[in-house]
């Protein structure tokens, strides 16, 4: 069975690739989890973030946006000293701001799914990826979404982070053409 080259790095990567990456997400909780994980990934390997994922879920109230929106200074400081956390002050302090912005956006559009797919007219983007070198780091789409999200109060949400997010939640299918997951939406 052929799979994308990056998925061969570890068991964490393979499992994530085979079961999640590029599969269409419809659940707001999952969207928020992926926004957090992609934000934490900046400057780190995705494999490292996947290894920390279970611990992050434990200390971040299972990625519950309503709970994270209420985090105060004491909670943020405790996260910075927790070994399960990715200890980057900017990333940790962006959590409650992003949670509040996420909840406001969901209230405005009815769901994050409705918001994100308005940028693609309700359609998935399926790219022609012959090999890993063909995969872009960002796109005009991720630039537009990043810009809009920043206007809405999100932090630590650049075009590269958003592109990775869009891949992860299935808005963009960047599986290599020969990968068995290419074109699978759910």
List where the protein language model places each region:
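HhH-family (HhH-GPD) DNA N-glycosylase catalytic core used in base-excision repair
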Residues: 1-186
């Amino acid at each position: 069975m052929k799979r994308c080259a990056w998925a061969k790095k570890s068991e964490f990567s393979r499992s994530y690739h085979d079961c999640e990456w590029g599969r269409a997400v419809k659940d707001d909780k999952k969207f928020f989890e992926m926004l957090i994980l992609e934000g934490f990934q900046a400057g780190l390997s995705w494999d490292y973030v996947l290894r920390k994922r279970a611990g992050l879920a434990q200390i971040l109230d299972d990625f519950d946006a309503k709970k994270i929106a209420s985090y105060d200074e004491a909670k943020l400081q405790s996260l910075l000293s927790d070994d399960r956390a990715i200890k980057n002050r900017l990333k940790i302090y962006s959590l409650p701001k992003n949670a509040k912005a996420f909840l406001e956006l969901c209230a405005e559009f009815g769901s994050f799914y409705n918001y994100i797919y308005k940028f693609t007219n309700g359609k998935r983007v399926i790219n022609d990826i012959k090999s890993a070198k063909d995969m872009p780091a960002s796109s005009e789409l991720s630039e537009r979404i990043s810009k809009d999200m920043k206007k809405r109060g999100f932090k630590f949400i650049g075009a590269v982070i958003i592109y990775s997010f869009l891949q992860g939640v299935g808005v963009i299918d960047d599986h290599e053409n020969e990968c068995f997951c290419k074109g699978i939406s759910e």
